[in-house]
Amino acid sequence: MTFLDTGILVGAVLKSHPEHVVCRAALEDSPRPFTNAHALAETFATLTGFYKVPTEAAAELTLSLRDAIAVEALALADYETAIREARSRGVMGGGMYDSLHATFARRTQAVQIVTRNPSHFQHVAPDIEILTP
């Protein structure tokens, strides 16, 4: 199973993204790709914030991901574990969200995380293979 990070999801759905082709390929070619519902919220936030995609289009793009990959909700235990791991690893600020994704990937037995930001995951997921498209 392969966990896809938010950056891959954004690049995969946004045709004007400079890495659209490789992100789309990562989504289509990964063995059993999946993500969590929080990554969908981050995708919508990134599309409407950084890329200024209108909310209606951003919602359609984000929700269309459910047809392409498996999406699972995070459990309270995922948040609790991620916070404990963030504390033990010295993770602060927005790195908490990468810790949350890594915790989820670990719980769901992902063998890989595909991301456009490998340095974000090397610290929070040293036990999982980190790939870039």
Regions found by a protein language model. Give the residues of each.
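Acidic, PIN/NYN-like endoribonuclease modules and their adjacent C-terminal/linker elements
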Residues: 1, 102-133
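Short, well-structured N-terminal submotif of metal-dependent ribonuclease cores
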Residues: 1-35, 50-60
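Histidine- and aromatic-rich ligand-binding microenvironments
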Residues: 5, 35-36, 94-95, 117, ...
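A generic structural signal for short hydrophobic patches within well-formed alpha-helices
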Residues: 9-10, 40, 121
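Helix-adjacent hinge/juxtasegments
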Residues: 53-58, 66-68, 72
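Internal alpha/beta domain cores that form substrate/cofactor-binding pockets in large enzymes
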Residues: 63-64, 74, 89, 93, ...
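Active-site neighborhoods of divalent-metal-dependent phosphate/nucleic-acid chemistry enzymes
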Residues: 70-116
